[in-house]
């Protein structure tokens, strides 16, 4: 099974399940979120595909593709608090063996920043010992981005940071996402 560790609410999420039935015949592929079935593919029944309502799961049927060796589902309209969870692909074979194999991936859903953070207040060069005063603002995200400072690709130890103030506020027009500003 392939699935993202973190899925972005700004994009659809794709889940893939590949399997080798060897000499056995595929009976069904089922997809679950938190032990609730939301999708079923059964190649020998009509209809082949069945979808079931599960909170936080919205299937994009045009992104679904299943056959005898793989099953891909595409989920859309992800939300952080409802689409997070344990996603499982379960594959079963026909009689007489009725073998069952499953794999689960925990997926975190977040709204990732669409842009790089903006830093203002810097000058072109600094000499050793100079004081640096700058402001870093992240673009909206949920949860709020964690601001980490680097100089010459080296992370700055927080004991050398004097944080003047930090603001974290909700941008209602952006769907309740958070923007963080750090003044140092």
Map each language-model feature to its residues.
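Structural beta-strand segments of beta-rich domains
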Residues: 11-15, 130-134
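Extended serine/threonine-enriched, polar tracts that run as long, contiguous segments within proteins
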Residues: 134-149, 156, 165-184
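Flexible inter-domain hinge/linker segments at boundaries of tandem extracellular adhesion modules
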Residues: 1, 32-37, 104-122, 151-157
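Aromatic sugar-binding surface patches on proteins
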Residues: 53-59, 63-74, 168-184
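N-terminal V-set
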Residues: 22-58, 142-163
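Short beta-strand segments of immunoglobulin-like
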Residues: 1-8, 120-126, 138-139
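Ligand-binding face of N-terminal immunoglobulin V-set domains in extracellular IgSF glycoproteins
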Residues: 12, 16-18, 28, 58-106
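Surface-exposed loops/turns
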Residues: 8-9, 80-81, 128
């Amino acid at each position: 099974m392939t699935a993202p560790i973190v899925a972005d609410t700004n994009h659809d999420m794709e889940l893939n399940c590949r399997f080798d039935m060897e000499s056995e015949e595929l009976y069904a592929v089922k997809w679950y979120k938190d032990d609730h079935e939301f999708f079923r593919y059964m190649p020998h029944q009509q209809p082949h595909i069945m979808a079931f309502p599960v909170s936080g799961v919205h299937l994009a049927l045009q992104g679904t593709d299943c056959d005898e060796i793989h099953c891909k589902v595409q989920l859309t309209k992800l939300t952080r608090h409802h689409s997070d969870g344990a996603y499982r692909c379960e594959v079963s074979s026909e009689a007489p063996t009725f073998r069952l194999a499953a794999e689960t991936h925990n997926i975190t859903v977040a709204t990732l920043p669409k842009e790089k953070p903006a830093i203002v207040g810097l000058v072109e060069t600094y000499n050793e010992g100079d004081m640096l005063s700058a402001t870093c603002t992240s673009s909206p995200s949920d949860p709020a981005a964690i601001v980490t400072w680097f100089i010459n690709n080296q992370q700055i130890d927080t004991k050398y940071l004097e944080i003047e103030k930090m603001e974290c506020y909700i941008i209602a027009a952006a769907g309740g996402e958070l923007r963080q500003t750090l003044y140092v």
